[in-house]
Swiss-Prot record:
Location within or outside the cell: Cytoplasm
EC number: 2.3.1.234
Role this protein plays: Required for the formation of a threonylcarbamoyl group on adenosine at position 37 (t(6)A37) in tRNAs that read codons beginning with adenine. Is involved in the transfer of the threonylcarbamoyl moiety of threonylcarbamoyl-AMP (TC-AMP) to the N6 group of A37, together with TsaE and TsaB. TsaD likely plays a direct catalytic role in this reaction.
Cofactor note: Binds 1 Fe(2+) ion per subunit.
GO biological process: tRNA threonylcarbamoyladenosine modification
Keyword field contains ATP-binding: no
Name under which the protein is recorded: tRNA N6-adenosine threonylcarbamoyltransferase
Family per similarity comment: Belongs to the KAE1 / TsaD family.
Amino acid sequence: MILSIESSCDDSSIAITRIKDYKLLFHKKISQELAHSEYGGVVPELASRLHAEALPKILEEAKEFLPQIKAIAVTNEPGLSVTLLEGIMMAKALHLALNVPLIGVNHLIGHVYSLFIEKEAVLPKMVLLVSGGHTMILDVKGYKDIKVLATTLDDSFGESFDKVAKMMGLGYPGGPVIEKLAQKGDANRFDFPIPLKNAKELAFSYSGLKNAVRLALSEMENLSEQDMADIAASFQKAAIAHLLQKTKKACEIYKPSDFAIVGGASANMALRKAFEQECAKRAIPIAFAKLEYCSDNAAMIGRAAVEAFLMNDFTDMDALVAIPRSCFV
């Protein structure tokens, strides 16, 4: 069994995964969304303190598995340095107490393996990763064989939702709030520009779209509930159209036989529907992680760690450090 820990941002989570068949034997997550909502975003120092409180409580619930643990896995990159450290400190303590190896896991690779929780990995795949901090198209051939085909030049898909929600006074996190509000709106009322529409480069950019929403808001007075819904719907439509356009371009270039979308923002139902329709047209199979595993969680870290364990890809204690910004390259 592998005990895995996730604390890269504002979710405290621990999981126990059986190595031989990937079975998830224990999984618990404590979200900090409510604590950060009044600040309009994650406050690193507060997040760190809340992890320090939550992780030991979760570990106490999983203590029956400790005698059977063969390795300790922990997210060590990328993320907020002060929150990553909370998970790393617990992992090192367990490593010393149980005398089992450590596995440092890249959080983004964890998102890829959220597709394969409790099952064998089916690769290669082209994977679109959409989250609060990242927007990437990946060519995934294996745990240690991942190539970045495209990334964002500025804001990520999820980050743009958070920032637009903050502009509109809708609170944090912005993704679910914008999505819910958009269901009541007219997505054609505001003609927000699709970023990089005519650009040849394979890249994403959300800063221009975000600024277009800011301009529209500044030009309106006494916004009604319907105005807010229309802005949310129009913004969401343009944001997804940009993802779709650049992913279609990647498919034309790389011709994948299999496609998947992962990350917290992949829980957006409008996004899922748009990509399901496009993949159906192209006869390309599409996969998503289960909704419960889209956002940050230790189950995906544990599943990725099984791959590392089977490759004897362990991390020395002194080398296990927090790496706030990283990638696969």
